[in-house]
A protein has these predicted regions:
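Short pre-active-site segment immediately N-terminal to redox-active cysteine/selenocysteine motifs
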Residues: 63-65, 69-73, 104, 148
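Hydrophobic beta-strand anchors of alpha/beta hydrolase catalytic cores
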Residues: 66-67, 97, 152
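A short beta-strand-turn-helix
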Residues: 38-65
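Active-site-proximal beta-strand/loop segments in catalytic clefts of secreted hydrolases
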Residues: 69-70, 100-103, 127-128, 165-167
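Short acidic-hydrophobic, aromatic-tinged amphipathic segments that line or gate anion-handling sites
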Residues: 48-49, 123-127
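N-terminal targeting signals for export/organelle localization
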Residues: 1-47, 183
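Thiol/disulfide oxidoreductase modules built on the thioredoxin-like
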Residues: 118-120, 128-178
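Structural microenvironment flanking redox-active thiols in thiol-disulfide oxidoreductases
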Residues: 79-119, 131-139
Length: 183
């Protein structure tokens, strides 16, 4: 009997300790460095580098960068498009808004139709790296792998500023942009 208990414990205890490991794949990926190559509907390239929890967009140092993770079928995403366009125009030299669609296989023509219909006058990227990027951002912000949209995340010089879940008033976003810019 003692022998069976000892054998059982020698099998079960290592399995328990494996389950208690603090280095999950998600945590490891948060520390790792990655580069995401994004292309908008006009063919403009954006290279986003993730270093730890920070996200940098090459060539946009000093700007506030906001990733708008959205879908064309999402009513709150549609409603926010004109507000984001207004902010992009107002803070043009200090702000970069990148719309990141969660829709696989959507045609650029469909995204351009969305931009036209809902007044989205900011870059919308449609690349094979979209999903990798929005999952990395969701992981870094601890939003989980299933998060509501729109999901917007703001960075300044790669550093996380804030994020918004769901439709957010333009005034709230603008207030955070001003704070990030030191205004």
């Amino acid at each position: 009997m003692f022998k069976k208990t000892l054998i059982s414990l020698s099998i079960v205890l290592p399995l328990l300790f494996l389950g208690c490991s603090s280095d999950s794949d998600e945590e490891k990926s948060m520390v790792a460095s990655s580069t995401f190559h994004l292309v908008d509907t006009k063919g403009v390239d954006y290279n986003v580098t993730k270093e730890g929890l920070n996200f940098y967009v090459k060539g946009h140092d000093g700007k506030v960068v906001m990733f708008d993770i959205f879908a064309t079928w999402c009513p709150p995403c549609r409603a926010e498009a004109p507000n984001l366009s207004h902010l992009q125009k107002k803070y043009n030299d200090e702000l970069l808004i990148l719309g990141v669609t969660i829709e696989d296989g959507i045609a650029n023509a469909d995204l351009d139709a969305f931009k036209e219909k809902y007044g989205a006058e900011y870059a919308i990227v449609n690349s094979k790296d979209n999903e990798k990027l929005y999952r990395a951002i969701a992981s870094a912000t601890k939003a989980g792998q299933r998060f509501p949209i729109p999901f917007m995340v703001m960075y300044k010089d790669g550093q996380y500023i804030t994020h918004y879940v769901g439709q957010t008033p333009e005034e709230m976003i603008e207030s955070d942009i001003k704070k990030a810019l030191g205004k």
